[in-house]
């Protein structure tokens, strides 16, 4: 993962993306105007619905040319 930056703001889940090959969930979300997605087969995708509508601090980086959540914490 490259170009990792930290963003703080309200998390909004836009849509659930198709599951990975192994059946793990994936989400497209927005944090303070920055649209990003969860990485394939990442455990963060299981915790993301718990943060929906709440203030979070997230590390967002570029993975294969797409903005991807690297880590997330509740503020």
Regions inferred by a protein language model and the residue ranges of each:
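OB-fold (S1/OB) nucleic-acid-binding surfaces
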Residues: 16-39
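Beta-strand secondary-structure signal
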Residues: 10, 26-28, 57-59
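Short nucleic-acid-contacting surface segments enriched for D/E, G, S/T with interspersed K/R
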Residues: 42-59
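N-terminal compositionally biased, intrinsically disordered segments and leader/signal-like regions
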Residues: 6-9, 36-41, 69
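Residues that cap or initiate secondary-structure elements
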Residues: 17, 35, 44, 64-66
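Residue-level recognition of conserved beta-strand positions in structured domain cores
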Residues: 31, 39-40, 60, 71
